[in-house]
Amino acid sequence: NVMQDMRRPGCIQLLANQEWNIYEDNFHEAAGNPSYMDINCIDFNPLHPDTLFACGRTGLYKFADGRFIKHYSYDNSPLVSVFGSDKNYVVVQGLTFDSQGKLWLINSMNKEKNLLTYQDGTWTALSQNELSTLPNISHLLIDSRNILWFSNDNWQNPAFFRYDMANNKLYSTTNFINEDETKFTTYWLKDIKEDRLHNIWLATDAGPILIEKKETTKESPVLTQVKIPRNDGTNFADYLLGGVSISAIAIDDDNMEEIYHFTSGNSPLLSDNIESIAINDATGEVFFGTDKGLCSYMSNASKTNDEMTSDNVWAYPNPVKPDYTGLITITGLSFQADVKIVTSNGVLVNQGKSNGGSYTWDGRNRKGEKVASGIYMVETATNEGNQGTVCKIAIIR
């Protein structure tokens, strides 16, 4: 099969300011349009944030302000169908915008024009022979070096690719050999992500695979299966999540080694079948897309800022009302920032280091007692000792 035919009706929903907006989805009912099915990737144009493109088994779709604008298929674009003139199988499994507003996408099974860009009504084909017969090219990522990464997520031809956008050169990896020169087998590559240190992570059925920053530009990069020491008096170690089939990866900025294992049995997670993960960088909220719906977990790590100013450092909830019993979060901090919380007359009640770009406080002093009503000052400094900014928290008891 070219791809798994899930027969899921197309649906795009946008959560903003605690309200859901549902994108137009009844346009496929017009004569001649294919079924609007199995949409699996979306991205917003960074130059026109109200414009969204979506793709999947039935081609490419453009929306603006939630309204359907255009469907791209074999009859109005370079895209081709796997089955001749069947619009239900114009397979576009991944897309992404670059910082200049250019859309990058790959049309699986297109022998002539598989790697494509689209901008301002103009299509450009950057075809690559190695991609001409691959059935499930997906998971596009443009990293901090302007390298385009993607994978063929198919058990018959598992591979990942790096495309040098500046020089139109493609590098492929089809043999999987780790840092110990041990060959390992993987059948699926479900996700690709970059971390804050500019390493690349691959989600595979053999576990997470790391490509260190220094390896990312090499023609044959070393693949690292991260080892976790057993700490049992031996020199033995186990691979991080070795043998666990990883379906999605999201990376926050906290650089911590602590691992939580959530299941539908020990948490409110809706299902153990995780299809996607995304993090709200501003708040640290982690969203899990499952086969039974969407749920979220409030972590205490958000995106770091290089500079802490009054414009990007703030606390929530604020004010803290009498019936609130959760944690108070200060966000917008730099990596491992020093945080001190003091009373209006300078008495220290709490201090610590940021976790990623956030710091959480339980509203208690150093004796474990709830602090009284009042205005509390949050003083910040960088990890190097440079003064940051100050924000205020109002507590009402």
Predicted segments with their positions:
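Glycine-centered coil/turn sites that cap beta-strands in beta-rich domains
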Residues: 307-340, 358-361
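Short, conserved beta-strand segments of beta-strand-rich sandwich/propeller modules, principally
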Residues: 283-285, 372-377
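Short, glycine-anchored, charge-dense loop/turn motifs used at functional sites
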Residues: 338-349, 376
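Glycine-centered tight-turn motifs at strand-turn-strand junctions
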Residues: 348-371, 382-386
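Carboxylate-rich, polar loop motifs that coordinate divalent cations or form catalytic acidic clusters
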Residues: 1-313, 348
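Terminal processing/anchoring signals of secreted or surface-associated proteins
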Residues: 11, 301-306, 315-318, 346, ...
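C-terminal tail/sorting-segment detector
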Residues: 377-397
